[in-house]
Amino acid sequence: INAISNFKVEIFRDGKLVSVYLEELLLNSFLYILGCALAATIAPAIVAYATSRFNFRFNVVLDGIVIVTMVLPIIGQDAALIQMTKTLGIYDTMIGMYFMKFMFLGFNYLLFKSSFRGVDKAYAESAQLDGASELRVMLSINFPMITNIFVIVFTIQLMGFWADWTTPLIYMPHSPTVAYALYELQFTSDPLLTFKPLQ
């Protein structure tokens, strides 16, 4: 119990060294993982629905962008991204992290797109004959039909964001998470926290 009460991370806030304890670390972690996982699940689902439902010429371009970003490493983007978030005023905020994670690029887009293509269009057509809007068709018919894919993608995103300590360190330096605290634990000299089974 002493080890848990001493579990903390020291960060600089307003030029002062501040200790962030387990309660705040857990709160930051849950806000980070839940919001980011939700954003990273909803964005590809919406874009995948639009590209699978409507045949635009631009769909091929979107698919190409997704594939290219999966194949080519984007090295050196952090400096530009930090500058952009500072310019927009969303650096070091949770809402800024949510905006950053609200993107459709990646494997989840392809997974959602193939799932939406597997849904029979007769359901949407019959709903539209009854007067349902396109938004209603998307939210009430197509999304519930692939709930299992939503749950799988959301769970994978949760696990990924739970273990991610570098992104909060870079983009939210004043809101450390438990993952970052566990990373910092290997460098501590506190005798209550250097007990080997704890590490």
Where are these regions (language model features)?
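A structural signal for multi-pass alpha-helical bundles of membrane permease subunits
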Residues: 1-199
